[in-house]
């Protein structure tokens, strides 16, 4: 076990799979006290079991629906009561976005649920955790944008997803402004296509589409959760103590080409 995050109490949402799982396991391996959550109880338990087997245990509140304010407050209050502080908040949870062209997208059934699952739950968690982050005196918020906050897609119709991730960029910059006087840093990570169960279910990590996207990267492959987790470790650690309001493109070079 390393110790880049030793002594840090970190909330990591969406630990049941994908990037959230990767961040939770990597943070624990780096010495953080991790309190995760997930809406899927079995998935959260599997991550807790994996961390236990690795000798770097984590805790979890599950099931937890982060689109419900009372559930968010329960999660934050549980962590704060158990550990007395919150130093890091990683908003990795998201609801699978609806993909449809703007002409076909239903407002109530597709557009609004996508924004609720990508923007509302980040706002709610930041709001609930904010007093504890301020009290910590030197804290870090890590939110997730996407390459699709910067560019559209010819392969998939993602009007709502692009809107949601663009909103995360803007919200996080404002969080950095508001948090600066209190020592609360806020940054975004904008991943490219990461191989997760969710992206596989969307058909994005295999076949012709995956090949097309991989070919657009400068490194010739799709990303993995740990590629993103290492960046999150840096942003959570004191190594990034003068970094705030920034975005980190972890995309294999897609946005550079």
Residue map of PLM features:
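Short C-terminal tail/terminal secondary-structure segment
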Residues: 2, 96, 100, 232-233, ...
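Canonical Rossmann dinucleotide-binding motif of NAD(H)/NADP(H)-dependent dehydrogenases/reductases
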Residues: 3-35
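Conserved mid-core segment of classical short-chain dehydrogenase/reductases
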Residues: 73, 95-112, 154-160, 200-204
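Catalytic Tyr-X3-Lys loop
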Residues: 106-124, 142, 168, 219
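Amphipathic alpha-helical dimer-interface segment in Rossmann-like NAD(P)H-dependent oxidoreductases
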Residues: 117-135, 149, 176-177, 181, ...
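Short, small/polar-rich loop/turn modules that mediate ligand/substrate recognition or access, typified
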Residues: 138, 180, 185, 243-245
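Catalytic loop of short-chain dehydrogenase/reductase
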Residues: 142-167, 172-181, 193
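C-terminal helical subdomain
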Residues: 177, 188, 211-239, 243, ...
């Amino acid at each position: 076990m390393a110790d880049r995050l030793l002594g840090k109490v970190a909330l990591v949402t969406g630990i049941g799979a994908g990037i959230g799982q990767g961040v939770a396991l990597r943070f624990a391996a780096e010495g953080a006290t991790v309190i995760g959550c997930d809406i899927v109880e079995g998935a959260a338990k599997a991550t807790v079991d994996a961390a236990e087997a690795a000798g770097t245990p984590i805790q979890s509140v599950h099931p937890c629906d982060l689109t419900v304010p009372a559930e968010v407050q329960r999660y934050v209050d549980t962590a704060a009561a158990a550990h007395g502080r919150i130093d890091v908040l990683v908003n990795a949870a998201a609801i699978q976005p609806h993909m449809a062209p703007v002409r076909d997208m239903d407002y109530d059934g597709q557009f609004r649920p996508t924004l609720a699952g990508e923007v509302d739950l980040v706002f709610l968690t930041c709001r609930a955790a904010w007093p504890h982050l301020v009290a910590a005196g030197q804290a870090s918020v890590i939110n997730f944008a996407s390459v699709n906050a910067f560019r559209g897609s010819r392969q998939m119709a993602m009007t709502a997803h692009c809107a949601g991730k663009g909103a995360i960029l803007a919200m996080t910059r404002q969080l950095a402004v508001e948090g600066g006087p209190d020592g609360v840093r806020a940054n975004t990570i904008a991943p490219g296509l990461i191989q997760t169960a969710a992206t596989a279910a969307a058909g994005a990590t295999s076949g012709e589409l995956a090949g097309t996207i991989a070919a657009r990267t400068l490194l010739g492959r799709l990303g993995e959760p740990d590629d993103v987790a290492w960046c999150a470790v840096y942003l959570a650690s004191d190594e990034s103590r003068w970094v705030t309001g920034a975005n980190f493109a972890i995309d294999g070079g897609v946005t550079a080409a």
